[in-house]
């Protein structure tokens, strides 16, 4: 019976992995027409840079996308980037970082660590540098922040974590009390294990809740109560409430800030406006 359960779990993981890969959207055509867009290579990975054609602000955002560490950029990510650029004038750098199960966090940080260093070295000292991500990308963003803090590299002026996945072990008992209409705990745990590899579950690079907090500053977390990642995000924020501003929305689902069609709801609209306000102020 136990063997059958794990076979079924592996089958379900294969289905969601396939669906997330085949659902990956191509770049929207209007990105090329309406924005300054470039696609570069860094250590054989694509790096997308998108910015406004006019009214550019001295703001650079490094954005790490979510997708449970197995999913690529989706159409809603690009729509979110376009909205952010239109409303802030910022330039957004989006790396196509390696994904599980072919890769673990070790391969991800082999690319993200030198890429981060390159970006901050090329920035003007007066440039507002913002690190941002959603879901798994938000967890990766925090881990990248912690890693660069240990390396004494320039840290972001602000870090914005949207519906962050901060602990792939998913062992917080409060998780089971969350009425999440989107995320499935068994699949998340399996994705997290694939990303962590053999020994990664003990590393803060996989689970930033285990990481150093002494250099944290200007960290903003937006999370909804109907998101099973909320309990760990809230716990982390409470433990570091002098360094982390936790913005919680009652009844909001996972990644509500990114869903443009849901901005008709009060919390989705307010969450998006809050992100814009953090970027600009």
Predicted regions and their residues:
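Domain-scale detector for complete catalytic domains at protein termini or as standalone homologs
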Residues: 1-134, 138-281
């Amino acid at each position: 019976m136990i063997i059958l359960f794990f076979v079924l779990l592996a089958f379900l993981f294969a289905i969601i992995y396939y669906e997330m890969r085949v659902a990956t959207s191509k770049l929207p055509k209007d990105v090329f027409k309406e924005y300054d867009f470039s696609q570069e290579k860094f250590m054989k990975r694509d790096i997308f840079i998108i910015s406004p054609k006019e009214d550019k602000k001295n703001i650079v955002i490094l954005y790490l996308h979510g997708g449970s560490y197995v999913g690529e950029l989706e159409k809603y990510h690009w729509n979110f980037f376009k909205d952010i650029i239109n409303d802030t004038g910022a330039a957004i750098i989006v790396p196509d970082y390696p994904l599980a199960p072919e890769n673990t966090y070790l391969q991800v940080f082999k690319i993200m660590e030198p890429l981060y260093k390159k970006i901050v070295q090329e920035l003007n000292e007066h440039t507002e540098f913002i690190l941002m991500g959603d879901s798994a990308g938000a967890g990766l963003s925090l881990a990248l922040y912690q890693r660069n803090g240990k390396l004494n590299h320039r840290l972001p002026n602000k870090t914005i974590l949207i519906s962050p996945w901060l602990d792939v072990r998913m062992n917080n008992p409060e998780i089971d009390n969350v009425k999440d209409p989107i995320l499935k705990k068994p699949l998340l745990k399996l994705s997290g294990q694939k990303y962590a590899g053999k020994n990664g579950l003990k590393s803060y690079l996989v689970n930033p809740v285990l990481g150093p907090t002494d250099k944290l500053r200007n960290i903003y977390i937006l999370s909804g109560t109907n998101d099973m990642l909320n309990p760990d995000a809230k716990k982390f924020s409470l433990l570091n409430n002098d360094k982390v501003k936790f913005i919680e929305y009652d009844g909001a689902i996972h990644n509500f800030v990114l869903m443009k069609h849901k901005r008709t709801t009060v919390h989705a609209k307010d969450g998006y406006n809050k992100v814009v306000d953090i970027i600009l102020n």
